């Protein structure tokens, strides 16, 4: 099913920068009202004011830490109390860590799993009935090309994104013919603040795409008559992901380890 933008409402997590902010801009340009969620209230307000003035859409800002239990129901109830129903959900919030597992901080690992996996599932479950009732929008979960193979040096991050890909493709099948477009977006290295958290651009492999290119890939997929369950952004990334799925597992792990050995 193709997307409806004008007059609908899109909820975007991790909206204060990077892919989240780009999704917000491109949806607003198409006439979507927005709910922007992230921890940084000042960044959200700045973005919201810009989008309101440029596109004349309604933008609701909800500063919130998503990395805790029950956040899906909390977010849903907060919007219901404001009379806001959601047509499109974009689960973009997440972060990655970089380095051998034995050197990782256990609390950071727990936070990474909570935000990248638990919060995404919780928010999806909370809003899915409303998304299905609307039938005019989409569920977009941001995965990664890291989902296609284990990555020594990014073991936890890669595993969380493999979960997101598997989970989203399953939900896409469960909801087929419902009118809801369900998509796992798998970008490769992208020019965002993600790498500030990860440990610098030395962790990136190959030429980075821009946020605009990645979001453009998602919108193109959502515009298809039959939206695929997942899409990889960038032809080099598509080729690499394809090889990762066809080569022996031990080979893909060794290649991935070499690709991130700069740390």
What are these language model-derived features?
Residues 9, 16-17:
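Conserved glycine-rich cofactor-binding loop
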Residues 30-47:
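Conserved glycine-rich Rossmann-like NAD(P)H-binding loop of the short-chain dehydrogenase/reductase
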Residues 144:
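Residue(s) in the substrate-gating loop at a strand-loop-helix junction
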Residues 100-113:
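Substrate-binding pocket helix/loop in short-chain dehydrogenase/reductase
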Residues 166, 172-236, 245, 249:
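SDR active-site lid
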Residues 124, 160:
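Active-site helix of classical SDR
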Residues 92-97:
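Conserved NAD(P)H cofactor-binding loop of Rossmann-fold oxidoreductase domains
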